[in-house]
């Protein structure tokens, strides 16, 4: 006949099984849709005045104004727990009520604080800004369309013709009245300056080969150009 060993009593060294969450913490009520966050409160708002305001929407389980631990002054926000979800919905129907003479903001606590106005903070996205405002703020320069006379370096005449000039070419001659007041002797004091005759010999001539075809056709019919013929170089005679 076999003898069964007696059951051992649990000693202090062995861990005991954990109790059920309901037995340890009790039955905790879900306040997801009943707890309300109240922000923007004035500093003189107390728990009693906060409760008095929300009593008009239904039964209240708790109304607390958060205060600073060191100074004991209000931090400007609090929490109100309503008895049921319907009362919380009625309390949040007005998102910006007047509490104790100041405009506050009310929303469910799990959703967080709601902004007072859509124009504050970063409520406006960058995509909604006007393009001109983005260019001024972020330094984005607009695209410019340059005229052909600026893009092409070979063109020597501006894109828009000057009304005061009859010809697109400006000829500087020694007989010009603007330069007649300067005597030729004034150029002799600079050893490396070109004489007026030498400068006039290069300025007064034009080269039709370098003029584009479009500009040559746009010139007036009465305008004539002086053809410059380069001197023929003769080889040195052998002696």
Swiss-Prot record:
Induction: By p53/TP53 family. Directly induced by p53/TP53, TP63/p63 and TP73/p73.
Compartments where found: Cytoplasm, Cytosol; Nucleus
Domain RRM: 34-111
Primary subcellular site in the record, as a coarse category: cytoplasm
Entry-linked SUPFAM superfamilies: RNA-binding domain, RBD (SSF54928)
Annotated GO biological process: 3'-UTR-mediated mRNA stabilization; cell differentiation; DNA damage response, signal transduction by p53 class mediator; mRNA processing; negative regulation of cell population proliferation; regulation of cell cycle; regulation of myotube differentiation; regulation of RNA splicing
Primary role: RNA-binding protein that specifically bind the 3'-UTR of CDKN1A transcripts, leading to maintain the stability of CDKN1A transcripts, thereby acting as a mediator of the p53/TP53 family to regulate CDKN1A. CDKN1A is a cyclin-dependent kinase inhibitor transcriptionally regulated by the p53/TP53 family to induce cell cycle arrest. Isoform 1, but not isoform 2, has the ability to induce cell cycle arrest in G1 and maintain the stability of CDKN1A transcripts induced by p53/TP53. Also acts as a mRNA splicing factor. (Microbial infection) Essential factor for the splicing of the pre-mRNAs of human parvovirus B19 (B19V) and for the expression of B19V 11-kDa protein, which enhances viral replication.
Protein's name in the database: RNA-binding protein 38
Gene symbol of the encoding locus: RBM38
